[in-house]
């Protein structure tokens, strides 16, 4: 991704202000990103769409799975599809918080301290193998993810807009891994699992990557202004009271049937993801189906049961037992 100008796309041609954006045009822009990423990631259409709904809903994404299934490649492909800044942070046990946020350095010529921003200051930040870093370093992301800013030595520095974190973590790190604190987990709008590709998809993938990897030739297909407008349009999607009430009943069910249920932040993320899902379907309003389509990926990782059940089971029960009224 670069900071260069990008040709105006249809979303910009049809609208001069966010309120005037054609939802169908935004949907077309999103589909162009999905198609672009699929030239690199074969057989993961649903995961790519879920990342896009998180981006439209101003959320962050956690990709969790076994090593080697393409988590980092997927994050890179999505980030490369936008014409903005992209930074990667490889989390390791010896990584310091200042390695993420940046430091103040004394300038001998000006006799003043100057801030040197860390890699967190980018439009799309890839936090690779985030669970390999100790909790203190992981916490460097908290303020940035929640408030789009970082405080270093008492001074607050704003993140570029838009700002999104796509983090990966492996599930088989054992003693070398640290559990993510719940305060950090709750800041991810979605948690996704890629899984292994289908046999035909894997054969197709091998044919694409044996020689020159397609990620090397991947180009941006939308500009930052496109993404800003798409986010603004998504925020304008109507969420009627019955849909808000339905989402709240789902969230309340998780609180009543788990040791730790979904937070109000999770409820907000559920509706924002529902707005983005409506945009993908070309609608200017959210329906219960949108909420249901996003519920597992938005809610399950925020739930702690304290028993044999996991968050996905609790969400499945909620979707089955909570009625749409």
Residue ranges and their predicted role:
Residues 51-53, 106-126, 130, 155:
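Conserved alpha-helical scaffold flanking the Walker A/P-loop in AAA+ ATPase domains
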Residues 23-61, 66:
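Pre-Walker A (pre-P-loop) alpha-helix and adjacent loop at the N terminus of AAA/AAA+ ATPase modules
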Residues 65, 128-129, 140:
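Walker B catalytic acidic pair
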Residues 55-93:
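Walker A/P-loop
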Residues 88-120, 176-184:
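Conserved AAA+ P-loop NTPase core
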Residues 9, 23-27, 177, 194-260, ...:
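Conserved C-terminal "switch" segment of AAA+ ATPases
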Residues 107-112, 133-137, 146-221, 230-236, ...:
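Canonical AAA+ ATPase core
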Residues 10-20, 256-325:
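C-terminal engagement/docking regions of AAA+ P-loop ATPases
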């Amino acid at each position: 991704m670069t900071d260069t100008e990008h040709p105006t796309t249809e979303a910009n041609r049809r609208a001069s202000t966010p309120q005037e954006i054609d939802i169908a045009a935004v949907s077309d822009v999103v589909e162009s990103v999905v198609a672009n990423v699929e030239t690199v990631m074969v057989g993961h259409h649903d995961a790519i769409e879920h990342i896009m709904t998180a981006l439209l809903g101003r959320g962050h994404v956690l990709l969790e799975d076994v090593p080697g299934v393409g988590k980092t490649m997927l994050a890179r492909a999505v980030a490369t599809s936008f014409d903005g800044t992209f930074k990667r942070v490889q989390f390791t046990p010896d990584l310091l918080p200042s390695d993420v946020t940046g430091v103040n350095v004394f300038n001998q010529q000006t006799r003043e301290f100057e801030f040197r921003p860390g890699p967190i200051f980018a439009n799309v930040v890839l936090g690779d193998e985030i669970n390999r870093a100790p909790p203190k370093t992981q916490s460097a992301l908290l303020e940035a993810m929640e408030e789009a800013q970082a405080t270093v030595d008492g001074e607050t520095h704003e993140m570029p807009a838009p700002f999104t974190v796509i983090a990966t973590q492996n599930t088989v790190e054992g003693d070398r891994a640290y559990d993510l604190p719940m305060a950090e987990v709750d800041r991810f709008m979605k948690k996704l699992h890629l899984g292994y590709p289908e046999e035909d998809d894997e054969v197709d993938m091998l044919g694409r990557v044996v020689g020159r990897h397609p990620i090397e030739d991947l180009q941006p297909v939308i500009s930052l202004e496109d993404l800003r407008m798409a986010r603004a349009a998504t925020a304008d999607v109507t969420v009627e009271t019955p849909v808000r009430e339905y989402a709240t009943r789902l969230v309340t069910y998780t609180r009543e049937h788990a040791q730790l249920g979904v937070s109000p932040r999770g409820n907000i993320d559920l509706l924002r993801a529902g707005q983005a899902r409506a945009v993908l379907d070309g609608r200017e309003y959210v329906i219960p189906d949108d909420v249901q389509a996003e519920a597992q990926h938005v809610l399950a990782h925020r739930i702690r049961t304290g028993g044999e059940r996991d968050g996905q089971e609790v969400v499945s029960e909620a979707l089955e037992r909570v009625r749409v009224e």
